[in-house]
Amino acid sequence: MVVEYIRYDIDAGRAEAFEQAYRRASEALDASEHCERYEVTRCSEDPTQHIVRIEWDSEEGHLSGFRQSPEFRRFFEAVGPFVHDIAEMRHYQVTLSSEDQSRA
């Protein structure tokens, strides 16, 4: 499993449109065999900052599977207008989780 974090800087006047776009895009994520979980969050201290967190089965599943699929085209159709608002987009490996602690 790999976690993708996408940090957006969205003008206040476009925040509702951004969240609506991700609601539409979520249908494509739900349909993907590679997407395990996702969430869209807005910073409470600075509402122009949003983070999208997507758990993928693997980096390859995301980059070679999802991005080559019809689901990606539907996903990008919805969120494409916000691509220039991306401040950072990276993949991370989980090194510690509360789920790990509960199994100990």
Q: What residue spans do the PLM features occupy?
A:
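Short, well-ordered beta-strand segments in beta-rich or mixed alpha/beta enzyme
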Residues: 2-9, 39-67
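Residue-level signal for secondary-structure boundary sites
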Residues: 16, 60-62, 97-99
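Ampipathic, surface-exposed secondary-structure segments
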Residues: 19-49
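Short, surface-exposed ligand-recognition loops at beta-strand->loop->(often short) alpha-helix junctions
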Residues: 9-19
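An amphipathic, aromatic/His-enriched active-site/gating alpha helix that lines ligand/cofactor pockets
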Residues: 24-36, 55-90
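Glycine-rich beta-strand-turn "strand-cap" elements at beta-sheet edges
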Residues: 2, 39-51, 76-104
